[in-house]
Amino acid sequence: MEADNYKYQRKELELKALLEITQAINENQSEEVLITIFKFTCLVHLNISSLIFYMSKEGGFERRISHGVKTKTPAILLKEAIEEDNGSGTLSIQLQEGYSFSELETYLPVYHKETLLAILFLTRKSKTQDLDIDFTQALANILVVALENKRFSRRQVEQEVFKREVEIASQVQQLLLPSSLPDTEVLKAKVTYIPHSKVGGDYYDLIRGRENKVYFCIADVSGKGMAAALLMSNFQAALRTLLRSNADLETIIHQLNFTLFDTTKGDRFITFFLGEYDFSTKTLRFVNAGHNPPLLFHQQQKQVEYLEAGTTLLGAFETLPFLEIGKRDQLNDFTLHLYTDGLTEAKNPLEEEFGEKRFRDFVEKSQFPDPKEFHYEFMKVIRNFSQDAPLQDDLTLLSLRFH
């Protein structure tokens, strides 16, 4: 009779334990609350005096509960330190010197579809009273599955947030880029833009100025995603404001650098090339701020030169250490090719880069003065070189033909 009463009382306690943990799960309690309830449920309703509970984490198992244990136990169990036999449920754990589970009587591995998700170490309160190992293991399994479901739901939410962020960043970027480029008797323009991912870090623009001037630029911002898109959006707004104020190139570059450094405190930077062409004086002025040097191709002479004069990249220093404004006079009938490093760093299956020399050779030998024809033929060359090898970065090529 006494034995029957004991069994009844034990089953009643187990039922209470089960109800407490399932009720907390149904109420969508936080991970910490669920773990705390599990801990006190084991200590109050089950024949357990001390326990340690490890849950799977990337690279190993993290200690989430430790109660009633005086010896030093590791906060993390590395996966490579655990040898498991799912069939027998036995584990062999290699501990570093100074750590021990000697105080604990037994351990219960918790599996889900042959994957070890948790380990429960415990000691009974009374050696004369039984501990239902199967029930304790089942209770731990319920907790672990609930926590895994929470993790899965959280990852889904994070993925949705990231997906939405990428979509917004992509929309922001599209708004930054010009919707059309000139195709007139005095200026023809063509751009090829191939982002490495949905949101690239390249930016280009062509802006009509006052007094027969036109401004053109290309930039590459460090980083990707929403942060890079917003940074470039602010950069473009500052650039256009300065151009509308009719500021000279020196003032524009210094102000852009100050604004960028003030915003990012040196954590982000932008490589940038800005050019200004005056149709009335046939003068080209430019600044290269750490960007790939554009190619200036003189159509009549069939000569190529790099436009390198300028300064360091923007945003790295509070004050630019030096600044040189490049200038070319009496320019007429010429083409400018502005590009980002995604072009020269494009690789073939042998991991060889396309490089600046191949691009310069193509420009020098080009028989395609029209930018559209030039881009069509050049993209055939680079595709033939890469043989469908994936791009390493965003690829942007902006070609401007001046007559």
Where are these regions (language model features)?
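Signal-transmission linkers at sensory-effector interfaces
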Residues: M1-E27
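Regulatory loop-to-helix N-cap segments in sensory/regulatory domains
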Residues: E2-K7, L117-L139, K224, I325, ...
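Helix-loop-beta substructure at the N-terminus of cytosolic sensory domains
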Residues: L19, A24-I65, P182, G266-R268
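Short beta-strand-to-loop transition segments that serve as allosteric relay/switch motifs
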Residues: E103, A118-T128, L147, V221, ...
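… and, occasionally, acidic/histidine-rich disordered N-termini of signaling adaptors
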Residues: V157-H337, A389-H403
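Active-site-proximal, acidic helix/loop segment immediately C-terminal to a metal-coordinating Asp/Glu
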Residues: A227-S245, Q330-A389
